[in-house]
Structure formats: structure tokens, C-alpha cells
């Protein structure tokens, strides 16, 4: 007789997921390509234990968010729309203003759009840490440097 094979699909359990810490330097990186890779790692799709309904992803620390690269004329032309739900409450935030005031928000907005918009997505988003400068307070977690192509 041959060995018996198990044809059961593996499903990760929340307690048995091992999480790693990665650090990404955003200096000169293209926003969309970097955000797609960050969303993939936050979701856990780079692991063989990926389970769609369980948080199997890792932590990501992004540094130098103020030096992010945008292709084309997006620095001058791109803007983010929001509304307060009050009459006349339309607000546009332009990218060149956000790069000066809150450069972290640009990366966070791009990654948030690539994550699921449900409870799992909110849980995944909490594992993203973005900092405008090169320093971050997560050195004690020993993050591994991650290259984004």
C-alpha cells in the first residue's frame, strides 16, 4: 500500500501565526508599487500559510515617507477628496501640501485603498507604521530591511 495522503486544506489559526517585522525605506520609491508590496505583506500573501479570513501578515515600518516618489505630474496635480457630510463641507488635500505637512498620510491612503474594507482590513492596517524621517521607535523588534522593486 502507498502512503495515505491528506487532501485537507490547511487553515491557519490566529494563535499559531508567527509575525515578522520589516522596514522599508521610501526614499525614491514609486508610491503605487511600494504600496502594493506593503499591502501584500500586511495581508500575509507572501506566506504559504495564507488564509483569507485570518490575519497572517507581518508588521511593516516605512521610513523617509517625505521622500516618496510620484510618477508624472502627480506632485502638482493629484489631490485627495473628503467631505464632512455638512453643506459646503468639501475638502481637497493636494499632494504637494501633504508632502510638507503630513507625508505619512500619502502612503497610508495608498495602502488603505489596497486592503479589504472590513474588520480584517482595519486590523491589518494597524500593523503599518509610517514615519516621515529616517528614525523609528521599533528598533527593539529587530526589523529586517525589505527591498521593494
From Swiss-Prot:
Protein name, UniProt field: Large ribosomal subunit protein uL13
GO BP: any one term: translation
InterPro entries for this protein: Ribosomal_uL13, Ribosomal_uL13_bac-type, Ribosomal_uL13_sf
Regions crossing the membrane: none
Pfam families tied to this protein: Ribosomal_L13
Molecular function per GO: mRNA binding; structural constituent of ribosome
CDD domains listed in its UniProt record: Ribosomal_L13 (cd00392)
A GO cellular-component term linked to this record: cytosolic large ribosomal subunit
Taxonomy, superkingdom: Bacteria
The entry's keywords: Ribonucleoprotein, Ribosomal protein
Entry keyword annotation includes Ribonucleoprotein: yes
HAMAP family, alphabetized: Ribosomal_uL13 (MF_01366)
Gene3D superfamilies attached to this UniProt entry: Ribosomal protein L13
Protein family per UniProt: Belongs to the universal ribosomal protein uL13 family.
Function recorded in the entry: This protein is one of the early assembly proteins of the 50S ribosomal subunit, although it is not seen to bind rRNA by itself. It is important during the early stages of 50S assembly.
Oligomeric form and interacting partners: Part of the 50S ribosomal subunit.
